[in-house]
Regions:
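Structural motif
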Residues: 33, 37-39
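Structural preference for beta-strand elements that scaffold enzyme active sites
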Residues: 12-14, 41
Length: 98
């Protein structure tokens, strides 16, 4: 009997919220930047908007990572799309969408 392991077919490393330290977490910029660093898998958190559309957000409220207030579940996706999810991180990402 052999105990040889089969090669692991899945990514060994997962980028947490994209490249969340280098770009605003859970944004397209964070995922693109993570991909340029060789990541093939990303961990993210999804929430539902008031009108039932999924969007990416870790926190229970909008304040830490956007210019919004309250919870995303109280807003329509159209309202969420207007939020700035980048300015909290750096000027380079000002205006970044969720």
């Amino acid at each position: 009997m052999t105990n040889a392991l089969k090669p692991w077919p899945y990514p060994r490393w997962v980028a947490h919220r994209g490249a969340g330290k280098l770009a605003p977490e859970n944004t397209l910029s964070a995922f693109r930047l993570g991909a340029t660093h060789g990541y093939r898998m990303f961990e993210c958190d999804a929430k539902l908007s008031k009108d039932g559309v999924l969007f990416l957000m870790h926190d229970a409220t909008l304040e830490r990572t956007t210019n919004g207030h309250g919870t995303g579940s109280d807003l329509s996706m159209g309202e969420i799309a207007q939020l700035d999810a980048g300015s909290w991180h750096s000027r380079a990402y000002a205006g970044e969408a969720l």
